[in-house]
Amino acid sequence: MQTGFVRKYTVLLLLTVLGYLFEVCVMPYLKIFGVTPNLLYVVIGIVTVAYGKLRAFWVGLTYGLLMQIMIPSVTFLNLALYSLTTLFCSFAFADKPLKTLEYERVVNRQRKELPAWLRTVLCTMLNTLIYEIVQITYIYLGGSAVTAAHILRGIADVVFTGLLCLLLQYPIRIAILGRRRTRPVLRPAPVVFSKN
């Protein structure tokens, strides 16, 4: 029990640090049509579905602080964007706690959840979309004309970040949660009481 706990949080710490280092050092050289996918939101999307809302918020807050310190464009913009978009998107895409799932099962209010891989990609793309909308709004409020090139670059960033998430989520989820083991499913059988 304790080994799994330590392993899971060690992987979370390494994922957070390596995600930031790769975003700053490697991703600027991996431009696709002049657009760099946002690796930080890929990591945030994966952490949101694999670890839950609270840990995703802490990773988003950490990334926001680091980006605010390293790239101080607008006062507290990166800090607010990374932490708040992570928090709001995690409500829609994070796994529900077991208590909530059991409560919904008892009161017959079950809803079908999307698969984890799809929720991860959608969470990443929604985070990136909100980030790009805020950036384009900031360009507009700064007095610059927003052109179709700005909008196309924003859309390209959302798509490329979603594709990067699709590529990276499986190896990272295996590192976090381990390989999925198939277990035999027990079939329900009627209970028979004997008179003895």
Can you describe what each PLM-predicted range is?
Residues M1-N196:
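Terminal, non-globular segments
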